[in-house]
C-alpha cells in the first residue's frame, strides 16, 4: 500500500513530534475493539482518555474481541471494515495475519523506542510473536475459588478442577477448548512438555475430552470474562477459570471471599492489530494511536488499573501502585517470580494452526 510505504519512512519523525501526517488528514473518529470489564476500563484510563485529550479524536468502544476473527472475516467479505484498532490474543493475531486480515507492523518504524533509545523490537523482544501483532500485556488464565467453600484445605493444584470428591460443587470453564484441553491432559498424566505433541493427534484430543467428561455435569460454561467472577461472588460455583486481572478485581477491589490458584496458570499475550484495508485517513489515525498507546509509560500506566504485566521491558521498572487502592501491583502480576513457579506456556502457533478443527470437535462434544 502506498501509504504504508510512506509511513515506514516518516512515522518515527512525525509521530514523535506529535504532529499529523502532512500527506494524510487523520480521521477524527475511531472504533477500538476490546474485551470489556476491568480490562477495557484499564485501557480507557491509560490510553483512550489521554489520547482523546491530546488529539480531540472521538473513540468509540466495541467489546467484541472474543469474536474478532469471525467478524473481521465477515467485514472483509462484505468489503466494509468498520473497526480501526482491535485488541486480540496472540493466537488470533497470527490467524488474522495469515489470512491477510491484519496489516503487517514494522515495530522499529511504527512504534516508539524506549526512553533510552532502545528500538521497540528489542524492548518488546520475544513477545513480538507475529508480523501483525503489537503486544500490550502478559496475562494468565487461572482458577479462582471460594475460600469459604473449600474447607481447611484450599486447592494448590490445577487438578483440583477435576477433584469433585475433594472439592464438591459446580465449576466454571470457558466454552472453548483452549486451556481446558491442556489442563485436562496435564491432570491425566501427560508431561507438561508433551502436551501439545499429544494434543495434535486425534487420540490426544479424545483423551482430553474424556478427562473433561468426568466433570462435564458439574461445569457451567462461560463465554464472557465477567461470568466466573460473578458466579464466584454469588457463591454459585466452588471454583472456575478466568483471567488473573478479573480475579484481582474480585479479591482486592470487591473484597469477596475468593482465592487465586497460580498453579499451571496459562501465560498468554494480548495486544493490538490494525485491520488490513483501512482508508488512508483511518489508517493514519490507527497508527498514531498505537504509537501513543504502546510507549513505555502508557503500558506501565495500564498496570495501575489491572494486574497484567506490561509487554515492554522498559515498562516493568515503572510498575507502581494501584491508582485507587494504593497497593503495590508487582506481587499481583502473573509474571511475579512467586506466582510463576509452575506456569504453562501457551503455544500460539499450535492454536493458530489447529483452532478451527479442535473448536469444531469441542463444540460437538459439548452438544452431546
Residue ranges of model-derived segments:
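A ligand-binding cleft/hinge motif common to bilobed small-molecule-binding domains
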Residues: 93-95, 241-257
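Mature extracytoplasmic/periplasmic domains
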Residues: 275-342
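Gram-negative bacterial Sec-dependent N-terminal signal peptides
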Residues: 1-22
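Periplasmic-binding protein-like
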Residues: 205-215, 253-276, 324-325
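Early extracytoplasmic/lumenal segment of secretory-pathway proteins
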Residues: 23-95
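Extracytoplasmic ligand-binding site segments that recognize negatively charged/polar headgroups
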Residues: 37-44, 82-83, 87-227
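Conserved C-terminal helix/tail region of periplasmic/extracytoplasmic solute-binding proteins
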Residues: 335-368
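A bilobed periplasmic-binding-protein/Venus flytrap-type ligand-binding module shared by bacterial periplasmic
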Residues: 142-149, 185-186, 269-282, 301-304
Amino acid at each position: 500500500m502506498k501509504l504504508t510505504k510512506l509511513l515506514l519512512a516518516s512515522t518515527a519523525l512525525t509521530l514523535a513530534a506529535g504532529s499529523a501526517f502532512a500527506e494524510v488528514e487523520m480521521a477524527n473518529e475511531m472504533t477500538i475493539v476490546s474485551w470489556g470489564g476491568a480490562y477495557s476500563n484499564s485501557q480507557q484510563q491509560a490510553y483512550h482518555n489521554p489520547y482523546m485529550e491530546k488529539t480531540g479524536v472521538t473513540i468509540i468502544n466495541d467489546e467484541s474481541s472474543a469474536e474478532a476473527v469471525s467478524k473481521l472475516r465477515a467485514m472483509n467479505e462484505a468489503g466494509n471494515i468498520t473497526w480501526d484498532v482491535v485488541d486480540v490474543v496472540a493466537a488470533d493475531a497470527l490467524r488474522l495475519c495469515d489470512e491477510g486480515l491484519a496489516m503487517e507492523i514494522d515495530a522499529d518504524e511504527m512504534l516508539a523506542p524506549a526512553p533510552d533509545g532502545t528500538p521497540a523490537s528489542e524492548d518488546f523482544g520475544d513477545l513480538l510473536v507475529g508480523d501483525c501483532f503489537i503486544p500490550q500485556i502478559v496475562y494468565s488464565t487461572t482458577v479462582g475459588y471460594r475460600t469459604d467453600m473449600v474447607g481447611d484445605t484450599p486447592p494448590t493444584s490445577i487438578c483440583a478442577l477435576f477433584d469433585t470428591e475433594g472439592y464438591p460443587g459446580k465449576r466454571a470453564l470457558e466454552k472453548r477448548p483452549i486451556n481446558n484441553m491442556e489442563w485436562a491432559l496435564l491432570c491425566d498424566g501427560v508431561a507438561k512438555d508433551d502436551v501439545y505433541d499429544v494434543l495434535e493427534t486425534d487420540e490426544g484430543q479424545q483423551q482430553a475430552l474424556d478427562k473433561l467428561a468426568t466433570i462435564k455435569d458439574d461445569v457451567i460454561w462461560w463465554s464472557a470474562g465477567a461470568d466466573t467472577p460473578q458466579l464466584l461472588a454469588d457463591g454459585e460455583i466452588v471454583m472456575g477459570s478466568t483471567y488473573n486481572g478479573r480475579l484481582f478485581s474480585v479479591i482486592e477491589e470487591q473484597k469477596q471471599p475468593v482465592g487465586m490458584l497460580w498453579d499451571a496458570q496459562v501465560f498468554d499475550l494480548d495486544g493490538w492489530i490494525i485491520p488490513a484495508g483501512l482508508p488512508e485517513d483511518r489508517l493514519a489515525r490507527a497508527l498514531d494511536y498505537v504509537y501513543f498507546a504502546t510507549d513505555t509509560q502508557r503500558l506501565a500506566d495500564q498496570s495501575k488499573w489491572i494486574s497484567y504485566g506490561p509487554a515492554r521491558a522498559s515498562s516493568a521498572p515503572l510498575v507502581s501502585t494501584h491508582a485507587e487502592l494504593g497497593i503495590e501491583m508487582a506481587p499481583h502480576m502473573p509474571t511475579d517470580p512467586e506466582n510463576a513457579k509452575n506456569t504453562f506456556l501457551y503455544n500460539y502457533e499450535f492454536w493458530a494452526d489447529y483452532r478451527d478443527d479442535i473448536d469444531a470437535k469441542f463444540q460437538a462434544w459439548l452438544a452431546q
